[in-house]
Amino acid sequence: MNIKTGQIEGFDVDMAKALTKKMYGKDAKVKLVQTTAKTKIPLLKNQNIDAVIAAMTITPERRKIVEFSQPYFGAGQSLLVPDNSTIKNVYDLNKKGMVVLAVKGTTAVANIHKFAPKAKVLEFDDYGQAFTALKSGQGQAMSTDNGILAGIASENPGYQVVGGNFTNEPYGIAVDKGQTQMIKRIDKALDELKADGTYDKLIQKWFGNVKGFDVKGAGER
């Protein structure tokens, strides 16, 4: 989502549209439902949505309750800081007085505690709130997956992604448990998008001009 306009847009949105056309025909349209880290799985399990294409990391715990596609994005946790920041990597945050901003319900919180245990983590309900806190000086860095931070940086001059990825957290498309045939169809469509160049075009569109972002690494899946 564009945190300035409130509009649902981004790499995942374009991927959802491209996948829908591959699976159901060029005239097919997708209905987009905005989710948060906390609501993704409940909405899926309650059949309010058919699939989650929303920066969802494939984890063993989640595999117990949902089915995942093949990885479609080489995500990893990174840092967003002002351009004039002296912070270069996650280890620079591992000292008393450092405050890191993150979103509740994401893997980011536990990872910061692991890699920078001396830092304090402030948790927010969504990425817009976390970035607002960064702008107002409530913390030295915001941390979550590289793709999300890249989107924020591209819309907000004066901020950059630093430190590379200090975790490996590939994104997958999730459907409800037991829908293995749907996953096969999604994987086939993903393979076709990669083969015809659509996937690489979307990577370049959304991440190609973001300072500090590893485009090649994101596309490795």
PLM feature spans:
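Extended ligand-binding regions for polar small-molecule ligands
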Residues: V13-K22, Y91, T106, I173-K211
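Extracytoplasmic small-molecule ligand-binding "clamshell" domains
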Residues: M1-I53, D196
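Short helix-initiation/N-cap motifs at beta->coil->alpha
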Residues: V30-P42, I87-K88, L122-T132, S136, ...
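Periplasmic-binding protein-like
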Residues: F73-V81, N146, A150-D191, N209-R221
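Flexible hinge/capping segments at coil-to-helix
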Residues: Q70-Y72, P82-V99
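Ligand-binding clefts/hinges and TM-proximal coupling segments of bilobed small-molecule sensing domains
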Residues: T107-L122, V161-N165, D191-R221
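Alpha-to-beta junction loops
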Residues: K26-A28, K45-A54, G97-V99, K135-D145, ...
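A ligand-binding cleft/hinge motif common to bilobed small-molecule-binding domains
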Residues: T39, M56-K64, N111-K114, F131-N168
